[in-house]
UniProtKB/Swiss-Prot annotation:
Keyword Cytoplasm: no
Described function: Attaches a formyl group to the free amino group of methionyl-tRNA(fMet). The formyl group appears to play a dual role in the initiator identity of N-formylmethionyl-tRNA by promoting its recognition by IF2 and preventing the misappropriation of this tRNA by the elongation apparatus.
Lineage: Bacteria, Bacillati, Bacillota, Bacilli, Lactobacillales
Record InterPro entries: Fmt, Formyl_trans_C, Formyl_trans_C_sf, Formyl_transf_N, Formyl_transf_N_sf, Formyl_transferase-like_C_sf, GART_AS, Met-tRNA-FMT_C
Residues bound to (6S)-5,6,7,8-tetrahydrofolate: 111-114
Protein's recorded name: Methionyl-tRNA formyltransferase
HAMAP family hit by this protein: Formyl_trans
UniProt record similarity statement: Belongs to the Fmt family.
Catalytic activity, reaction form: L-methionyl-tRNA(fMet) + (6R)-10-formyltetrahydrofolate = N-formyl-L-methionyl-tRNA(fMet) + (6S)-5,6,7,8-tetrahydrofolate + H(+)
Gene name tied to this protein: fmt
Organism per entry: Pediococcus pentosaceus (strain ATCC 25745 / CCUG 21536 / LMG 10740 / 183-1w)
């Protein structure tokens, strides 16, 4: 039986941890996750999904605000584990910890490396309109997501997928790929492959500025941006001067000569807006500032009489 330290935080990581716990050949001797965070309007202190799995299975949990230089780091090194497995942990691992394990430290990364190194690979794959993504298992090294690749698996991105659905799919894909790869790694039957540095791209954590949708983009990429930021952090337009979160859009198979951001047509249940490259989108769910998420029908009930074809309702000036 091989001993494992598992490190992860969000929902993506939880099924991967559970699979290692369920495997009789592995002994998860410690779980490292981010500290409990205040969540929601009531700021309820909430454990991470990974912590919930660990506690349920009576596994010791470590939650350093910063692992490097912490007392927890010293204790983890002293565990003398066979393996470290990380999956969306959210912190850099000190080399002293990586070098302390007997077999190796591996990371389950939610992209087809070397594409999309960094903290938001799923968001960027969808926002950029990619047709596929996947999971790569790599050795942990000092440089972020730059280790040699041990295994990869691909999965399509559909026009209906968002970050939530892709995280679910990629979590299970990563779980299965890890369970296939670890026995080969333990037996020494894996041939690591270096990443092609010329093909590297990055997916940094989403900044507040990145959340605004550029209506000058083609309709396909406007919709991809909405899905690529749903269910978090949620994209927005500046609609008639107010920040309005956009939860759901649909690409319409028609063209228009109206300027991006202008109303193409409006009914009681539909609002079509012009995008870049003569495209058209339907806004289907949105959330005006200070209000709850609502359907376009409910929104139009309140403001519909003020909207007419040709009216500029979305700011299309991205130069500010």
């Amino acid at each position: 039986m091989k001993s494992i330290i598992f490190m992860g935080t969000p929902e993506f990581s939880a099924p991967i941890l559970q699979s290692l716990i369920d495997e009789p050949n592995y002994d998860v001797i410690g779980v490292v996750t981010q500290p409990d965070r205040k969540v929601g309007r009531k700021h309820v202190l909430t454990p991470s999904p990974v912590k919930k799995v660990a506690v349920k299975n009576d596994i010791k949990v470590y939650q350093p605000e910063k692992l490097s230089g912490s007392a927890e780091l010293t204790e983890l090194i002293a565990l003398n584990a066979d393996l470290i497995v990380t999956a969306a942990f959210g912190q850099f691992l000190p080399m002293s910890l990586i070098n302390s394990v007997k077999i190796g430290a591996v990371n389950v990364h939610a992209s087809l490396l070397p594409k999309y190194r960094g903290g938001a690979p799923v968001h960027y794959a969808i926002m950029n309109g990619d047709k596929e993504t996947g999971v790569t298992i790599i050795y942990m090294v000092k440089k972020m997501d730059a280790g040699e690749m041990l295994a990869t698996a691909k999965i399509p991105i559909t026009d209906q997928d968002d970050v939530g659905t892709m995280f679910e799919k990629l979590s299970l894909l990563g779980r299965d790929l890890l369970l296939d790869t670890l026995p080969q790694l333990i037996e020494g039957n894996v041939q690591p492959v270096k990443q092609d540095e010329e093909q590297v791209s990055f997916s940094p954590n989403i900044s507040p500025e990145e959340e605004e949708i550029d209506i000058n983009l083609p309709a396909r990429l406007v919709d991809a941006k909405v899905r690529g930021l749903r269910p978090f952090p949620v994209a927005y337009f500046m609609m008639e001067g107010k920040r309005t979160k956009i939860w759901k859009t649909k690409v319409i198979d028609q063209t228009t000569d109206l300027k991006p951001g202008q109303v193409v047509s409006k009914t009681k249940h539909e609002l079509l807006v012009a995008t870049g490259e003569h495209g058209v989108i339907s806004i289907e769910e949105l959330q005006p500032a200070g209000k709850q998420k609502m359907t376009i029908t409910d929104y139009l009930n309140g403001v519909g009489e003020n909207l007419h074809p040709g009216k500029q309702i979305i700011d299309n000036d991205k130069s500010k």
